[in-house]
């Protein structure tokens, strides 16, 4: 059974090819000798016309190249022009316009975000500088052990100077009072020294 089916499969293509050949033979056999001659003449004419058209096309292409060379249009310029034209056509499409608008909007958002970050950083540095200056001038610093030690030494030194100069206030005082007293005592000492110098000059 399988051998018979295979035989049928093998014979069918052959029968089809034979049918085509028979059809061609039948079609050509239907033409008369006069019609065959007319078709052959028409075939020759068509081939001649195609050859002539190819020659004309080749001549036109050569003439086109000559004109472009005279106008200074080379292949690179043509490519640039084609690219520019294609780019312009692409920019006018709706998809490109939507994409361009989306990217522009995103760029504006990014720029605004960077500006906000820069402003925040500048403000933070300004607050830090103010905090440092404020902390230096705060009373808490004057209450530190280092500043108190320095203040006590200054008061002690000034008190000893006042004792030598002849001041009456030996009770210390605040740091500002000590500084004022020292300045006053120094001016008195300078005045006494100048009077003593004048007296010596008069005695001479």
UniProtKB/Swiss-Prot annotation:
Q: Where is this region: Disordered?
A: 1-31, 164-204
Compositionally biased, Polar residues: which spans?
179-195
Keywords in alphabetical order, please.
Answer: Coiled coil, Methylation, Phosphoprotein
| NADP listed as a keyword | no
Mind naming one GO cellular-component term on file for this protein?
A: cytoplasm
**GO MF terms on file?**
protein homodimerization activity
Q: Which residues carry this modification: Omega-N-methylarginine?
A: 133
InterPro entries recorded for this chain?
TPD52
Instruction: Write out the similarity annotation.
Output: Belongs to the TPD52 family.
Family annotation (PANTHER family): TUMOR PROTEIN D52, TUMOR PROTEIN D53
Query: What does the annotation say about its assembly with partners?
Result: Forms a homodimer or heterodimer with other members of the family.
The name on file for this protein is Tumor protein D53
Organism equals Mus musculus
Taxonomic lineage of this organism?
Eukaryota, Metazoa, Chordata, Craniata, Vertebrata
